[in-house]
Amino acid sequence: MRTEALYIRPGQIEVNYLFENTTDNPITTAVFFPLPPISAVLDYYTDYLDATHQFRFKLWVNGKEQPYQTQFSLQQHGRPVPSFASKIWKYPEESLDEATFHQRFLALSPAERQTLIDGKYIYWGYMLVLNKQTGESGEQEGWLMSDRHDTLWEKQITYSWEQTFPPHKTITVRHTYTPSYKTINTGAPFSKCIEGNSPAYQLFSAPAAQGEKRLAAQNYLEYILTTAQNWQGPIGHFNLLIESPLKSVGCFDGGPFYAKQFYAINRPNYTPERDLSVDFLDNKSVLGYQPKYAPVLYRVNGPAKLRSTPHGKTLGQLENNTYIWGCPGKKQGKWIPVLQNQFSGYAHQKNLIQVF
């Protein structure tokens, strides 16, 4: 993989890849893109519950939209749930409430039902059932897949497609999807490397002005980076951009990050060893956030000067053949804003070559 550009914002994840086949022969292989495990219980999903495909996955190869396959498997705290249980779902991305699960479970064969009962994959208990006429919920007994603690079922969804890589040529692959979020009721971050009571987090989430509320972690997502280890060698140029309405925190490369509107990473010859997590901080849900401008990944044709303003003070130098994120929608004249963490400013468009 020559280049990867990963752009994460509330409501959408976009990934662009540039692949190169350096051999003398075409290579045809299956490409797999797994999502982080999610609960099979309805209320663990985002608020896109009525969508046929909540994740809205789309795939393009060399600019043309392509078909793909969707598979899923079920686990209960790390142990596989028998594969026949997947018949309970009509399609991989379907989410079920407990009452529907109970009805679908009863439609299994007696032997299949007994296997799940004997294996303690399910239990008999009380569920909340919505009365659609009154709008009120009441308790009802039935077979449950999870009590949120001891018998939680997780669903692992994977998208796949067959890809041919021509010899000595490059191809671009792009896919987008709506990630699954956890909504945080306590306001404490889910990311494991962020300590909510630490001085660093308390200072970062403090009110910006007197009378304002402290920022709280509202929505949490995960992204699997380590699948890149399946490709030959490291990623030539890995580029990450996280955009949030106000601030975000999370874990990258096993360490914490604290970011304002943008968090940008550019790593040459990168082999990810840990996955990524993000908590978006705000005083309300961020799922409706829509950015005004689309970011672009550039390769520097330089060296190029980075200025505080167009024609302003020189802040530093962008080295030749390095990669940076920019926002051409906000350019002033021929000067494009650079969206790096501690190295932001303006660069002249003549020194920037668009990659994705």
Residue ranges with predicted function:
Residues 355-356:
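Short, solvent-exposed mixed-charge patches
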Residues 162, 312-317:
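Short, surface-exposed secondary-structure edge patches
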Residues 60, 305-309:
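Core beta-strand residues in small-molecule sensory/regulatory alpha/beta domains
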Residues 1-293:
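Lumenal/extracellular ectodomains and adaptor appendage modules
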Residues 317-351:
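SH3/SH3-like beta-barrel superfamily modules
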Residues 157-158, 308-313:
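Short alpha-helix capping/helix-loop boundary micro-motifs
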Residues 49-56, 299-302, 331-334:
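A short, compositionally biased
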